[in-house]
Amino acid sequence: MLLCFSGASSATFTFVNKCNFPVWPGILSGAGSPPLETTGFELAKGESHSLQVPAGWSGRFWGRSGCSFDSSGRGSCATADCGSGEVECKGGNAAPPATLAEFTLGGSGSQDFYDVSLVDGYNLPMVIDGIGGSGKCVSTGCTTDLNRQCPAELRASGGMACKSACEAFGSPEYCCSGAYNSPSACKPSLYSQIFKNACPRSYSYAFDDATSTFTCTGADYTITFCPNSPSIKSATGSSPKSTQATDNSATAGSGPGSDSNPTQDTAFTNSWLANLAIGDSPRCLPSSIIGITLTVAISFSLLQFL
């Protein structure tokens, strides 16, 4: 399917679904940007769809999963639902948690600016590739299945998505709000570091600009869902399934997946430390033991960055 605008100053955006389940891309144009000819569509396993996006456009794309729509096109999605009750989002934004691809085309010096953001959480692996442009045109995104590494307190939709710490706890220090609304005051948290370790080129928190925003000039773009594997599974060990339109509530997951790796071990170590820091650790230990354990755990965590 090719959706076109008139005029030559446009970029071709191609959406590719390498997941082993359908994905429903959602589209939201930024303030002052013209709406595209679609705001949402279904992308079956193995399919690709393209559309033209005019110069000067800004907005975001995301993938919805676990969707169920009836014969009249009414329904909802288990993750990243846009609230329209339809396949087309019609100006609706992605409900967190959602992996977001964000673009500003033809900005400063005619450059395109783009990023993949986990600030609103994560639901699907996603990669942006710039094609045929000039400049660095770095590929960016998150290829890791963060649902398998998601701390239990951040899990949503039965393990099909992973909340940000801001969404989960609402604290100003996690949301970079109030007194923390500046780069100097809002620093990476242990939770955002889990996201950053797994996806180094993605935004992990609100002020993660330096290593997360990229530029290209005159390029076309490919947005790929599940780029690394034909079978991306949730933390429950099964692929996302379509849900009934009346069932899109977020449900806390149980335990971690059966697979284990160093990154996942680090994630759960950091999760325990974060709980301890905010007083939610499930363990009650003498202060001397806590001190020794905390020292060892922090040392182990820091070694992962060396």
For every predicted segment, state its role.
Residues 1-306:
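Extracellular low-complexity, O-glycosylation-prone Ser/Thr/Pro/Gly-rich "stalks"
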